[in-house]
Design a protein with these regions (language model features):
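Short acidic/polar active-site loop segments enriched in Thr and Asp
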Residues: 16, 62, 119, 178-180, ...
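Glycine-rich phosphate-binding loop signature in dinucleotide/nucleotide-binding domains
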Residues: 45, 115-117, 176, 234-239, ...
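Alpha-helical recognition/docking segments in bacterial nutrient-uptake
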Residues: 1-4, 59-171, 175, 233
Length: 335
């Protein structure tokens, strides 16, 4: 049996098609009598309007596309949760697409979401090329970049001040009596690695301390383990007592190396990470780290995007900077 159409509803209700449309969209006043006839006809026919067709007419789908690098990454899942929960409060549904770091997949995701008539796009990725940015701008759909520190002009975001937070982390070690503090970053530099190094270097320079920066091959726990021998060698030669790592994973990998080589943490070295990932809470010793408010970043970001979609106040005229939190655990001690 064929699905009923808006024409069938109008015929049964004894009104015009435009009257049915006004009732469905609540766009213009309709008399109570006509409204009742239309609603009765809709219920009798079990009429379900084609949402895509309605969205094309009204230019309103109540859909927001979220492109994520990898939903399996813990903090990205927290960002998505903030986006989704606040989006639902504003009556928006989320369409999720994963790219796994592939630029072609990211381009395809943008094209796919455009065909779904999304009203806005959130991109959650650590690395976005200038070419992708051009594609987003050309698409004419309001968009928001999260988890991407960049120097693109006139594209604001919600974030923490990574330079300030790394500065405060090194300051915490200094206040515990550590004066020889090393920093482990990544060989492959990007905007984020550079601002974290700047935070470390700023405190070191302000306090006339000696800088020691070591580069790991990557940001996994295996990379932290593999850099262990080099870190210990340099730490011994420079009398280092505390080491700050780019993230929690490399810090925990290094601690694992120490455990395998009869080096005690924090007795021999104080170790700190960055991110407050689950691994920092379950590994022993529990890791001193910096907690990033990822849920709040996602929640504020989606609220800003929805306001932009609706033509309301732009709450992201400048970057919205949130405070992170130092979480002191068992991997550090006073020197």
């Amino acid at each position: 049996m064929a699905q009923p159409t808006i024409k069938d509803v109008a015929k049964l209700a004894g009104v015009s098609i435009s009257t049915v449309s006004r009732v469905m969209n609540d766009s213009k006043p309709v008399s109570p009598e006509a409204r009742k006839k239309v609603l009765d006809a809709i219920n009798k026919l079990d009429f379900k309007p084609n949402e895509l067709a309605r969205s094309l007419v009204m230019k309103k789908s109540n859909l927001i596309g979220v492109i994520v690098e990898d939903i399996g990454i813990e903090y990205m899942a927290q960002l998505i949760r903030g986006v989704e929960e606040i989006g639902h409060l504003y009556k928006y549904d989320i369409i999720l697409s994963s790219t796994y770091g592939d630029d072609n997949a990211l381009e395809n995701a943008i094209d796919f979401l455009s065909t779904k008539q999304v009203e806005g796009i959130v991109v959650i990725s650590e690395d976005i090329s200038a070419e992708i940015l051009v594609k987003l701008r050309d698409n004419k759909i309001p968009f928001l970049l999260l988890d991407k520190l960049h120097d693109f002009k006139k594209i604001n975001t919600v974030k923490i001040d990574y330079e300030k937070e790394e500065y405060e982390l090194v300051k915490h070690l200094f206040e515990q009596g550590h004066e020889n503090i090393a920093y482990v970053t990544l060989k492959e530099h990007n905007y984020l690695t550079d601002v974290k190094i700047a935070g470390y270097q700023k405190f070191i320079n302000e306090n006339n301390l000696k800088s020691m920066i070591i580069e790991a091959d990557g940001k996994t726990s295996d990379d932290g383990y593999n850099i262990g021998e080099e870190v210990i060698s340099q730490a011994k030669s420079e009398n280092v007592s505390a080491i700050s790592f780019y993230n929690d994973q490399t810090a925990v990998g290094f601690i694992s190396y120490c455990l395998d080589n009869n080096i005690k943490i924090p007795e021999d070295y104080s170790v700190v990470g960055f991110g407050n990932f689950e691994i920092s809470r379950v590994y022993r010793p529990k890791l001193t780290t910096v907690s990033i408010p990822n849920y709040d970043i996602g929640a504020i970001g989606i609220r800003a995007l929805i306001k932009r979609i609706r033509g309301e106040e732009d709450i992201l005229e400048n970057d919205w900077v949130l405070d992170a939190q130092l979480i002191e655990r068992d991997s550090t001690k006073k020197h």
